[in-house]
Amino acid sequence: MSQYVDLGKMPESPEERRNLIEQRVTMEDYVSHLEITHIQRRVLEFLILQKGYTQEDIEVNKEFKVQLGDISFDVMADVVLKVDGKRFLVIKCAINSLDSWERHSVAFCRVVDTYRIPYAVITDGDQARMLDALSGQLLTEGLDTIPSREKAQQIVREVNFSPLPNDKHEREKRILHAFDAIKCPATPTGLDQT
């Protein structure tokens, strides 16, 4: 009995079919070795199979250290897209309430690197909201609106990767730190466990 395998598109030739199957097997092998959520898995499959990104273009669970005065804290990006040596898009995988993560994602993109990462996406694996992290404005909605690798290369050539002005840097770090402080604990606390 044969099994249906989603190749992302209908192959136009036996050679293309072989290439798509090879790409799918490579992606499955890559994803199977990562400690990721089901949403991250769906996003990675989409990026690799539908948008043409390679493993080298994708950083998963990437940690960044942020210094805020005397406080140092770590923040993590669920998925980062990096093309031609530049991080240009950060993806936040959220279970629900995508719009509640917009401000966090914008602050994240503005302060975690030596330059402002220009775009942020918040997704639950089905829906997505893409933001211009420089202005904070919503650009598009829908997973399909994430740029392809080819389009990303064009974006990277056209965008000015400049740092956030110093007078705004501390404010964005404080916003990021506030979101970091309200994370839910991994285990229940304060509950009577008898």
Language-model segment annotations:
Residues 2-118, 129, 134-194:
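A short, conserved, highly charged catalytic patch centered on acidic carboxylates
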Residues 123-128:
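Short beta-alpha junction loops
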